[in-house]
Amino acid sequence: MSANVLSSLLRLLRHTGLRIGALLLSASLAACGGGVSLGFGYVDYDDDYDHDDPYHPDWPGGGTASDPGIFLIAGGLCPTCGGSLDGSGSAARFDAPEGIVLGPDGNLYVAERASGTIRKVSQQGVAVTLAGSAGASGSSDGAGGAARFNGPTRLEADIDGKLYVTDSGNSTIRQVSAGGAVTTLAGAAGQCGSQDGSATNARFCNPQGITLDRNGNLYVADTMNHTIRRIDRNNAVTTVAGVAGACGSADGRGAAARFCEPRDIEVDDDGYLYVADSANSTIREVSPSGEVRTVAGAAGQCGTADGPGASARFCNAAALTIDGAGTLFVADTGNGAIRRIGSSGAVSTVVGTPGTQNVVLGPLPGSLNAPRGITVLAAGSLAATSQNMVLRLVPAR
């Protein structure tokens, strides 16, 4: 099977929850190791029968987790429950978790920015450290705890289980094997710049978003260069859109376009890129030919309005993901909410209460605190990072 087909298959699996042999990527999320938390309290709910999926516990007091709501997967149940600690459910701790992705093994992987680690969260809500050492910042390749990162922000997974990480504080792109071995793929640690060319000669500046297309190309939101970069399968780096150092907002082709601190990027099956243009509070689209247009929001207008794309408003949206139907979900960080952009371009709020920066778990609307990472699971559910937690979200249909 070709690498292109494998890449396409991974994206299909991530967005549809199909099975191949014994591999099930249909993952919904377990709450607190057998319990469900409401608000910041914890309700111990023991059950003695199997569920269709270990990430789908029942709600205490009736109903099921397939009902719209917000569920805890792992992390502390209070605003000050930080730190970095392996453990199960609410016993685990995260320190500024940001990017999140569903791997081909059915586990979630999280870039833990403040601790400088990559964490793995099982379908049972057990969090372990895959690579890096909490609190030990630096840039070292190596296996597991011997590796060092400096503010890893987002990550992507391929069909083989390799992770691609934007090591933002080092201005590099790192690769993590399924076993936790870390190598530097592109850029040079501590050298913020903008240079195309071979991976070793290329330079980035605080890159944050990263995505993988069906042809095996990586695309990077090079945040402080205000550009979109591509790393092809030969590890050659090129600039796709924007101009290094030119913060602004302009639609157009390639170098005629302008971004301002783009923080995340996602690609659909047709090769269109979607960018969370955070400082502009807009969502942008980049066509395969490099044509950039604004999909939703208005540059420089931070707000909460739902509605048609041009009428909608976001506030420092920092992350996005796309499902198999082409629906975009946006982690609207400054508003503390998850927004949906349908095929018509209409924007709606599907999780959280815009303007309320607080985590309240349970039935919708609930609320979130500065969600910074989001990924698609199966059957219409999402996983997100918010505050110091990893959450499962079931938007209203």
Named regions from a protein language model:
Residues 2-5, 10, 22, 26-69:
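Bacterial Sec-dependent N-terminal signal peptides
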Residues 116-120, 126, 171-175, 181, ...:
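A short loop-to-beta-strand structural motif that recurs across blades of beta-propeller domains
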Residues 151-156, 167:
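A generic tandem-repeat structural signature
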Residues 370-397:
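Blade-level signature of beta-propeller repeat domains, shared across WD40, Kelch, NHL, RCC1
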